[in-house]
UniProtKB/Swiss-Prot annotation:
Keywords: Cytoplasm, Glycosyltransferase, Purine salvage, Transferase. Its main location: cytoplasm. This is Adenine phosphoribosyltransferase. Disulfide bonds: none annotated. One of its GO terms (cellular component) is cytoplasm. Catalyzes a salvage reaction resulting in the formation of AMP, that is energically less costly than de novo synthesis.
Length: 181
């Protein structure tokens, strides 16, 4: 990825101060999604390391991970698996509790979403502390997935999420980093 593209990509992400609470700068990718060239280039860059590889499924974390994950699944000719918050999927599910900054939450996936041994890329818009992604990887592994990578448009490196995922033995692909949180 060229430095020019990285700068263009960063510029296409809206910063919303003090959301969802004071002191937080929310990185809003809806502006990137609304720019066809930026969206296409972001997907192409996220997919690039796995072009030509056998990827069976792309798993996207609710909600922006669905948008990015669907586009990536299309690019690599794979299926798509939604990972949702508890109670949102209609069929029999497997769930995983994961740590939040203050407390815990649960995510779920359909019990039959993955055939054991399938190669899966996990996708979301942003990685911060890595709690949700860590829970998603554990959940996918619980149902037999081989998680071959985790892809995020944005990394907040000060919060350590990407390092946490790498420590789980999963390669991480991010496109841009923003300081702070």
């Amino acid at each position: 990825m060229t430095p020019e593209f990285a700068n263009d990509l960063k510029a296409s992400v809206r910063a919303i101060p003090d959301y969802p609470k004071p002191g937080i700068i929310f990185r809003d990718i809806t502006t990137l999604l609304g720019e066809p060239r930026a969206f296409r280039r972001a997907i192409d860059e996220l997919v690039q390391p796995w072009a030509g590889s056998k990827i069976d499924k792309v798993a996207g974390i609710e909600a922006r991970g669905f948008i990015i994950g669907g586009a990536i699944a299309h690019q690599v000719s794979s299926g798509f698996v939604p990972i949702r918050k508890k109670g949102k999927l209609p069929h029999t599910c497997v769930s995983m509790e994961y740590a939040l900054e203050y407390g815990t939450d649960k995510i779920e996936v359909h019990v039959d979403a993955i055939t054991p041994g399938e190669r899966v890329i996990l996708v979301d818009d942003l990685i911060a502390t890595g709690g949700t992604a860590e829970g998603a990887i554990k959940l996918l592994r619980q149902i037999g997935a081989e998680v071959v990578a985790a892809c995020f448009v944005i990394d907040l490196p000060e919060l350590g999420g990407a390092a946490k995922i790498r420590a789980m033995g999963v390669p991480v692909r991010t496109l841009v980093a923003f300081e702070g949180h």
